């Protein structure tokens, strides 16, 4: 752990010029420092952490605990320059939290400062909590990850002609390869009645766009399906289920779903990239992004995932089930793989890492774990443009322990390249666009590598721009009005196309998009099934 001189760098009290804007280091962290100093002073007789253990041997050279002051300065500078509003950080090493601190405003208008116990919207870091909840059901034989999700769905089923819906297994639903397309929609307080239940969402958007298992497409609908599955097999609403099966037994007392209205005032407000407050909103897929949690709680969730059996935490999963959460399901070209709820990969030296990012209007979050090094980093922010700061903080922290650290990209998809027309794509195609209340005729004409048009219904042909290849898929952007209640209501008319060959057809989706991703936006998926035009 290093000598006492090194460990004194944990005294991160704010300098005199920053004391008014930055809280002192928490009592929790001070206790950790004293405990670590005592452990070092008696020659390591005490265990590294009374909070847990990790059974995996280290395979990389991990440096002694670093001086976190440079990272603090990076965060304080971002806040003082108006590039951040509120930030919370936690670092785990050797089975304990070695640093946790809050900076700036959780709610500037209410005068609420950030602490390590401030609940932030996690956005997509919610997904591992959802997957963990499903895994507890699998461990009790209430469901099987390798069975079709439809086996556990009651009111609404996964449907579609672009492959076999039974290929959309529980595991694939949580690993972004179920064939369901991506989706996002936010609802402010005045639109709360428009937010669909998981069953209603599946009824409107639960159609596969691609053959299950054939390609990666990051998807929130799959996690809505997982929520519906969990509720159906238990008879309990999903927010309550996550609380009962994960949050409470793991001692994550700062954590709650957005549906817990009474607790929302304790959470961090959300701000756009200019620092303006964003009105409260919910989303169409709560199980994919509506959990609130503090940096302290996320750090303890990381301890659970790294098999540090924390004192006071219930054993909700045996180690083999935890390992199942982290097992690669779909490996992308870069070597990054999806798991059931996570992404994973390896450094050049072979050191494995597990990670998840979160991002939506007013939210940027990051969690990286290196289990073999018993090392993890959590950064939570409440700004739309917080991704760069999250990455910068986490990268600097992890590199101070493992110099070879390089941040991976959270995708298992191929990199885009210029589109080159092939016989599989070239020519005229006709078919249908379906989802929500829409069922429209569609015509596509791919004339060359840089010329294509799309026709929706009886509307004029629209040019497709930005034509690219993503592995075997064709992508491009067009415009048009889709005759569905959601597209009309939101004014979503920018159309993002993705198509791939399948059994002589082209199958895929159009995403109808609108809005500003920094404030409020929408991505609505409509499934395409196209055959060669006969005339």
Predicted regions and their residues:
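N-terminal secretory signal peptides and thylakoid transit peptides that target proteins
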Residues: 15-41
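Short, well-ordered beta-strand elements
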Residues: 366-369, 373-383
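Short, glycine/proline-biased beta-turn/loop segments that scaffold the active-site neighborhood
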Residues: 145-161, 250
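Short, gly/Ser/Thr-rich active-site loops of penicillin-recognizing serine hydrolases
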Residues: 381-443, 509-535
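Short, conserved catalytic-motif segment at the N-terminal edge
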Residues: 65-122, 142-144, 158-159, 195, ...
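C-terminal segment of N-terminal export signals and the immediately downstream linker at the start
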Residues: 27, 48-81
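Short, surface-exposed loop or secondary-structure junction motifs
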Residues: 96, 103-107, 161-361, 365-366
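Central antiparallel beta-sheet cores of small beta-barrel/beta-sandwich binding domains
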Residues: 430-496, 522
